Regions:
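Conserved RecA-like helicase ATPase core segment
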Residues: 449-542, 685
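Conserved helicase NTPase motor core
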Residues: 128, 136, 141-150, 154-156, ...
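P-loop NTPase Walker
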Residues: 17, 23, 29, 37, ...
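ATP-hydrolysis module of ASCE/P-loop NTPase motor domains
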Residues: 294-391
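Helicase P-loop NTPase motor core
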Residues: 216, 224-229, 233, 499-501, ...
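Phosphoinositide-dependent membrane-docking surfaces
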Residues: 22, 26-53
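Conserved helicase C-terminal RecA-like lobe
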Residues: 565-567, 594-595, 605-667, 675-676, ...
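Anionic N-terminal interaction surfaces
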Residues: 1-20
Length: 688
C-alpha cells in the first residue's frame, strides 16, 4: 500500500517527502527526485498523525540515539487514508517485531547458558573459549538476519546479561578470572608456601595460575622467575591439568636446561621426570630425527667457533684468488671500510685478519638463520637508507653463504639454523605431531624470529589439543640483538598473540629500593619498554648508587675491604673485554675479604653479587658508539628508534646485578648516561 500527495500539495511542499509506501520490512519515502528506504530496525514502530487545513501528514520516529531522535515527516497526504495507513504500518512492524523476538528466543537460552557456564567454569577462562562463543553468536545473527543492535532493541532485559561479554570482553574476562583466582589461590596455598624455601608472593602465585591461550610473565631482575616456572609445573601436575608428558620447557642454553631439569627433580621429584626440558637445538634435532629417515648430523664446523673461523679463512683465500672477486672486495672497501680495512693493495695480506673473519662469520650466520633467497634479502633491505652499501656487502658475502650450503650438502650435514628452519617446516606440514599441551619458555626476551616461528607452529597445529604458551622474560633485559634476539617479539607480544594475558612479577628479592629506583626509572625512559612496577623486598633510606671518577676504583675496593666483616663479592663490569683493569690480579690478592671478578655486562646477565662497579662509563664507551649497520644489523634492526635503546637495557642489567651498592665510574664528564643520572632527578650520590 502507498499514500501519495496530489499534485497541488506536491507543488506547495516543494522538496519535502510527499509519498510513503510499505515494502516488505521497509518504509519507502519519496520526494521530488529522491527516495529513502527506512528499514524496520531503524524505525521504532511509532507514527504520529498530523492534520492540516487541507491535507494530513504522517511522522515516523527512529530509535533514540545519545538523547536525540530522528524523524521523517510526509506531508500533503489524503487525511481520510492516513489513519488506515498508520494502523497498517504499525501492524506490519509488530508482525516483524514478533518474528524477530521468536528468532531471538531460539538462540538466547543457549547464549545465556554459555555465559553462565563461563562464570561457573572451575578453571581459568581463556580467550579462545570466549572467542569461539562470539564467533558462534555472529553466525547466529547472520542466520537470523539480525544485528546485535536489533537484539538489544527487541529484548533489552534479556540481552543485558550477555552484552558486557560482547562489548567489554577483556575487562569482563579479567574480572571473572580474578574472582576464580581468589578461590584457586586458597586451594593451592600449601603448594605455594612449600615449593620454595620461602613462600611465593602474590604476583608469583597469580603467574603460576595463568592459563590463557598465550601468557607472558614479565619478570624483572631478581623477581623469582625460576620459582614461577618450577611451581607452575608442580601446579599443572598436581591439579591434573597435565601429565608430565604434556609439558615442554624450552631454554636457550644447555646449562640453563640442565639447571631446570635439576630443579624439577629436587623440588617436584619423580612425577616431573617425563617433563621434556630442551634447548631449541635439542628440540629441533628431536623433530628432525623423528621425521627424517636418515640420522641428522650437525656439522662439526658449525659446532666449533675455531673451526668455523678457519673455514671462513680458507674460503676467503680461495675466493680472493679469483681476480674479479678480489677487485669487487677492493672496490667496496675503498668506499666503505669493513673491520677497519680499506681496499688498498695490501688487502691480500689481511685474509686472516681476525676482525674481518669475525665480520664474515657474523654475516654468514645471519644469512643462514634467515634461509632466504638473495632476492628476498634485497627486498628486506631495499627501503634502508644505506641500501647501496648493504647491497654491495650482500654481493661480497653471498658467495660465502652459497659455499657454506654446498659444503653442508656435500658432507650430508646441517647447521643449527637449517635445523630450526627444517623443524618448523615439518611441524607446519603436519609431519611432526607435537605431543605437548603446555609449552613454557624461559628468558623469552632472547627469542629470535626463527625460534618463535617454530614455537608458533607447535602451538597452532590444528587438532583437538589446545596448546598453552607460557613465556617468562623481561623486555628490560633484552640485550642480545647481535645474536638474533628481537625485543619487539616481547614488547609486541599482545599484538603477535591476540589471545593473550600479560602479567608481571612485582617484587625483586635481589636489590634494595634505592638501586631499584635508579635502575627502573632509567630503563623506562624509553617509552617502548613495557611499563611495570618492580618493588624491592629490601627497603632502605640511604642512597645506594654512587657516581665516581674512574681513578677511585681502588679506593672503593679498599673501603669495602676494611668495612667487610665477612667475605663479600664484587663484580667489576665493563662494556667490553678491554675494560678489564690491569690491576685486577693485584686487587684480588690485596683485598682478602673481597671476592673480585671482572665480566662484560653481557656476560653478567643472570648473575648476582653484593657490590657492582661499572667501569669506564665514558663517551663512546658506554653507551657504545653507534656504528654503521652491516647486513646482520640491518636485517635484525628493532623497530624501536629510541637513542641507545639496547645500550640502556644493558646498563640496566649491569646496575641490577648488585644486592647492596653500585658505583658508576667515569673519566671527565662521562657519557650521556652519566650526565642523565647526575643532571636529572635520580637518587644518586655524585663524588668528584
Amino acid at each position: 500500500m502507498q499514500l501519495i500527495a496530489n499534485k497541488t500539495a506536491q507543488y506547495l511542499i516543494q522538496n519535502e517527502y510527499h509519498q510513503v509506501s510499505l515494502e516488505s520490512d521497509f518504509l519507502v519515502l519519496s520526494s521530488r527526485g529522491s527516495e529513502e528506504r527506512i528499514p524496520f530496525n531503524v524505525w521504532n514502530g511509532k507514527v504520529k498523525l498530523k492534520r492540516g487545513l487541507f491535507w494530513g501528514g504522517l511522522q515516523f520516529f527512529a530509535h533514540p540515539e545519545e538523547g536525540k531522535q530522528q524523524s521523517w515527516l510526509i506531508q500533503g497526504l489524503p487525511w481520510e487514508r492516513c489513519r488506515y495507513f498508520a494502523r497498517l504500518a504499525v501492524a506490519s512492524y509488530q508482525k516483524w517485531h514478533h518474528h524477530q523476538c521468536v528468532q531471538l528466543n531460539k538462540f538466547l537460552p543457549e547464549w545465556e547458558m554459555e555465559v553462565r557456564g563461563f562464570e561457573r567454569q572451575p578453571a581459568f577462562l581463556n580467550h579462545s573459549t570466549v572467542n569461539a562463543w562470539l564467533e558462534k553468536m555472529n553466525r547466529d545473527f547472520l542466520t537470523m538476519e539480525m544485528t546485535l543492535e536489533d537484539a538489544l532493541l527487541r529484548m533489552p532485559d534479556r540481552m543485558s546479561e550477555i552484552l558486557p561479554w560482547i562489548d567489554d570482553t577483556d575487562e569482563v574476562m579479567a574480572t571473572r578470572n580474578q574472582r576464580w583466582m581468589v578461590t584457586e589461590l586458597e586451594n593451592w596455598k600449601v603448594l605455594f608456601s612449600q615449593i620454595e624455601s620461602s613462600p611465593l608472593n602474590l604476583s608469583q602465585q597469580q603467574a603460576v595460575l595463568l592459563n590463557d591461550d598465550n601468557n607472558l610473565v614479565l619478570a624483572g631482575a631478581g623477581s623469582g622467575k625460576t620459582s614461577v616456572l618450577t611451581a607452575r609445573v608442580a601446579y599443572l601436575l598436581q591439579s591434573h591439568l597435565a601429565q608430565a608428558e604434556d609439558i615442554l620447557m624450552l631454554a636457550f642454553g644447555r646449562d640453563a636446561a640442565e639447571e631446570m631439569k635439576q630443579r624439577l627433580e629436587n623440588k617436584i621429584g619423580l612425577s616431573a621426570e617425563q617433563v621434556t626440558v630442551n634447548t631449541f637445538h635439542q628440540l629441533g634435532l628431536k623433530i628432525l630425527n623423528q621425521v627424517e629417515k636418515d640420522p641428522v648430523t650437525i656439522s662439526p664446523i658449525a659446532l666449533d667457533d675455531n673451526l668455523k673461523n678457519a673455514w671462513c679463512v680458507d674460503w676467503l683465500k680461495k675466493h680472493w684468488m679469483t681476480p674479479t672477486a678480489f677487485k669487487r672486495w677492493q672496490k667496496h672497501l675503498q668506499k666503505w671500510p669493513i673491520a677497519y680495512l680499506a681496499g688498498d693493495d695490501e688487502l691480500g695480506s689481511h685474509v686472516e685478519n681476525p676482525k674481518l673473519i669475525a665480520w664474515l662469520n657474523k654475516q654468514l650466520n645471519q644469512l643462514s638463520a634467515m634461509g632466504c633467497t638473495k632476492k628476498e634479502i634485497q627486498q628486506r633491505l631495499v627501503d634502508h637508507n644505506d641500501y647501496t652499501r648493504l647491497n654491495s656487502e650482500l654481493a661480497l658475502v653471498w658467495p660465502c653463504y652459497q659455499a657454506w650450503l654446498d659444503m653442508l650438502k656435500s658432507e650430508g650435514h646441517i647447521d643449527f639454523n637449517i635445523m630450526i628452519t627444517k623443524a618448523t617446516q615439518h611441524v607446519m606440514k603436519g609431519k611432526f605431531k607435537a605431543p605437548w599441551k603446555y609449552i613454557m619458555i624461559d628468558e623469552y626476551q632472547d627469542i629470535s624470529p626463527q625460534r618463535l616461528a617454530l614455537v608458533k607452529a607447535l602451538c597452532q597445529q590444528k587438532d583437538e589439543r589446545n596448546c598453552v604458551l607460557f613465556a617468562v622474560g623481561d623486555d628490560w633485559q633484552s640485550i642480545y640483538e647481535f645474536a638474533g634476539a628481537d625485543v619487539d617479539l616481547t614488547t609486541g607480544f599482545a599484538e603477535r598473540f591476540p589471545h593473550s594475558t600479560i602479567h608481571h612479577l612485582d617484587t625483586t628479592y635481589r636489590f634494595n629500593n634505592q638501586i631499584g629506583e635508579v635502575a627502573n626509572q632509567f630503563v623506562q625512559q624509553n617509552p617502548a619498554q613495557l611499563e611495570k612496577v618492580l618493588q624491592s623486598h629490601k627497603e632502605q633510606k640511604a642512597k645506594a648508587v654512587t657516581l665516581a671518577p674512574s681513578n677511585t676504583v681502588e679506593k672503593i675496593l679498599d673501603e669495602l675491604n676494611r668495612k667487610a666483616k665477612s667475605s663479600q663479592t664484587v663484580l667489576l663490569l665493563g662494556r667490553n673485554h678491554y675494560h678489564k683493569p690491569e690491576l685486577l690480579s693485584e686487587w684480588q690478592k690485596q683485598f682478602a675479604l673481597l671476592s673480585i671478578e671482572f665480566m662484560t655486562c653481557h656476560a653478567s646477565k643472570g648473575k648476582e653479587t653484593d657490590f657492582v662497579i661499572v667501569l669506564s662509563v665514558d663517551e663512546g664507551q658506554f653507551p657504545a658508539r653507534v656504528k654503521a649497520l652491516h647486513i646482520d644489523g640491518a636485517l635484525t634492526q628493532s623497530e624501536d628508534t629510541f637513542p641507545y635503546a639496547e645500550e640502556r637495557r644493558l646498563f640496566y642489567v649491569a646496575l641490577t646485578r648488585a644486592k647492596k651498592k653500585v658505583w658508576i665510574t667515569y673519566t671527565g664528564s662521562g657519557s650521556s648516561f652519566v650526565k642523565e643520572l647526575t643532571e636529572q632527578d635520580y637518587p644518586v650520590i655524585v663524588k668528584k
